[in-house]
C-alpha cells in the first residue's frame, strides 16, 4: 500500500503584507476579507500542534506574512519551535517566513526548525506578471540559503495563474536544480479581491501538472496543497489518481486564509483510496 505524509499549517502571523503578490489575499494591496493579527499566542499554536499530531500530521509549518524575516520574527519562531519540541510530539517543524539570509536561517536551525519553505511560485519569466515588489531571484537565493544553512528545503509553486506550459516547465527545471526535499503543488482558485482573472484548472489539467512535476522531481516529496478541495471536488476517482501520478504528501486541514477539507473526513477519504498514513518522517 502506498504511504503518504500528512503536513499541517499554522498561520502564526496573518495579513497586512506590503508585497503585491497577485495570488495572495494577505497582501494589503488587495484588501481581502481575512483575519489579521500580528503574532498568534503560543498556547494556541501548541494546541494546534497537539491536535494535528493526534490526527496523524508529521509536518507542522509555522507561517508568517510579510516580505522577509526580521529579528522579531526570528525570535518568535525560535520560541515557538523550542516550545513545540519540548512537547516531544515527533513533529517535523517547518518555517515559512519569506526572504531570509544565511545567518537568520542558521539561527532558526539552532532553535529547532528542521526545514524552510520558500516557494518559487512560477517561472522566472512569468514572475514579474504576478509580483512587482520583489524578484524571483530573491526567492531563489533564499532557497539556496536554506540549503547552505543545513535545513531541509520545501519549495514549489502555483499552477493556474495564466502561465504557459513552458513557464511550468521552467519553474520545475529551476526547482530540480535546488533538489528540494518537498515540493508543494498548489492550484490557484479565483478570488474576486485578487487581480488574477484565471479559471480554475480542470482536474485533468491539474493531474497533467502533477505528472510533469514527477518527471522533473522524481525524488522529491510531492505535496498537494491549496486548491485540491476545489479542483477535485466530488471527483474521488480523479483525486485518487493524484497518488497514482506521484503525490505522496498532503496538507491536512486549513491553509493560510482559506478552508481546507475537514481533517477527519479527509483522512477517511484518503484511506478509502487504499493509502496508508506515514507514522514517521524518514
Curated annotation (Swiss-Prot):
[2Fe-2S] cluster binds at residues 61, 96, 154, 221. It catalyses: (4R,5S)-dethiobiotin + (sulfur carrier)-SH + 2 reduced [2Fe-2S]-[ferredoxin] + 2 S-adenosyl-L-methionine = (sulfur carrier)-H + biotin + 2 5'-deoxyadenosine + 2 L-methionine + 2 oxidized [2Fe-2S]-[ferredoxin]. [4Fe-4S] cluster binds at residues 17, 21, 24. Keywords: 2Fe-2S, 4Fe-4S, Biotin biosynthesis, Iron, Iron-sulfur, Metal-binding, S-adenosyl-L-methionine, Transferase. Pathway: Cofactor biosynthesis; biotin biosynthesis; biotin from 7,8-diaminononanoate: step 2/2. Pfam families: BATS (PF06968), Radical_SAM (PF04055). Its cofactor is [4Fe-4S] cluster; [2Fe-2S] cluster. GO terms for molecular function: 2 iron, 2 sulfur cluster binding; 4 iron, 4 sulfur cluster binding; biotin synthase activity; iron ion binding. Belongs to the radical SAM superfamily. Biotin synthase family. Homodimer. This is Biotin synthase. It comes from Helicobacter pylori (strain HPAG1). The gene is bioB.
